[in-house]
Amino acid sequence: MAAEKVREIEVPQGVTVTVSGATLTTKGQKGQISREFRFPGISVRTDGGKVIVETGKDDKQTKATVGTYASHIKNMMTGVSEGYEYHMKIVYAHFPIQVKVEGKDKVTIGNFLGERKARTANIVGETKVTVQGDKVVLTGINKEDLGQTAANIEQACRIRKRDPRVFQDGIYITSKA
């Protein structure tokens, strides 16, 4: 697919988009997200019910960045209107893993492979984490924060110096919505 110099994104009903300098803010029923879009030669503006990302340059990197910005803006609009949800599953063979949410910024994973010390994973941004039996549900409006939080939880359960074909314990992403 050839990269385009101009991308137009329709603003869904119930979402308002404002551009102030290089900062784009989306507001919807689930909340508000602001993000700075600063790249030489690329401008982001609103026109009626559309957000327009455009460039005057012809080089590959600039055109690719136009597409990247368009995707980020679509994700922001989807997040404030519908939200995102990741489902993770707690998997263990012998030692039952105990997962607890501490405050708004940490998840503790206890008794992982029988370890005495609990492992921790950081919660990024405004992501909400709930534990329901052997399932962990992450919800939020920022797709990047949600994905980073899920990655932090998966990486906290990474098994080192053992055969991964035998030791398959951990917390894994099962679905994204």
From Swiss-Prot:
GO terms for biological process: cytoplasmic translation. One of its GO terms (cellular component) is cytosolic large ribosomal subunit. GO terms for molecular function: rRNA binding; structural constituent of ribosome. Pfam families: Ribosomal_L6. Keywords: Ribonucleoprotein, Ribosomal protein, RNA-binding, rRNA-binding. It comes from the Archaea. This protein binds to the 23S rRNA, and is important in its secondary structure. It is located near the subunit interface in the base of the L7/L12 stalk, and near the tRNA binding site of the peptidyltransferase center. Part of the 50S ribosomal subunit. Belongs to the universal ribosomal protein uL6 family. PANTHER family: 60S RIBOSOMAL PROTEIN L9, 60S/50S RIBOSOMAL PROTEIN L6/L9. This is Large ribosomal subunit protein uL6. The gene is rpl6.
